[in-house]
Amino acid sequence: MTIVNIESAPAVESAGSSNPRDYTDIHIRWSLKDGEPHVDCVGSLVFPVVKPGERPRPQRPAKVIYQLLDELAGSCFAVATATKDFLIHHAETNVFFRGRFDDRAVDGTWYRLRVISAKPPRLENLGFPMPTIYVEQLMDPAFARGGLIAVMGQAGSGKTNTASAIVVSRLHRYGGMAFGIEDPPELPLNGWHGEGYCTQASVAGEDGKDWVESMRGALRSQPVGTDLMMYLGELRDASSAQMALRAATNGFLVICTTFASDIISGLEAMLNLAGREHADTLAHTLRVAVYQTLLPAEGRLLVDTLTSDGPTSRVGVILRSGDLRRLEDEIRYQKHQVAAEFARMQAARARAA
């Protein structure tokens, strides 16, 4: 099928690039001609990469990118009929895109594509550095016995990057096996990472049963005696939240992301999703709750954490009570402890220098 007749598209003579890595996002608009789908090259949008602190702005595509739009549209068309969210790979440039099929816009049907890294992130080389003290919290070897790490934040705060980096970094340091269950996979984690291996599954977000079945499959196929992780893009419903807690009590280190305005609201959301009767299980499984805020203009990642040593710890007792507002004092206390430890580390470095 002919996706687009490039020669018939009016030329846009503005400067541009055919390298997809020169863009953060590419939005491809479809139009119908004689009942057949075609790409409207002129009506599409590209968002060029900008300098740190600047915000990408939409531009009309230059003619040099029309062939790329055609190729990407063909890849989208092949997968977007089964799911609205998808991952595609442009083989010629080895660039991955996270895509969304948008058929609700008043000006036509769109493929909204985000360029993603071809190299999985690690905690030590995130785009916006995470302080070492928090990295070491997340790399605690004791977590290999199982539990829950929840990465929280608002939209665009880098939750997926951090959660993925936890998986990759722990596989590199400790080996083992990780199961990724996402809608769709947002970063290319599948494959070997040092002595550890990650396998990714793409599930359809419209049906919660797909999530539960994928999680159940991971539980059934766990290798005996191996360090195990389960990475969930996001908890979607009660069944998946309950299954995540079950996995965390069954030897998996479960890593998930959730939208939140702070740590307490994030834990409240998880508990409400799973059911308040699962407060005791959350108290048994929670290892670290991470809340992060991205400040792109300053090149900074602000991080707060809440760690728990189990159901009899101060955090565990509060979680079991169900009154999560009482965590405020513990969060402040732990933040003070982290600040004091950071000051000691800085002083030690100064003496060593």
Model-derived segments and spans:
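Short, flexible helix-loop junctions that flank or precede catalytic/ligand sites
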Residues: 3-353
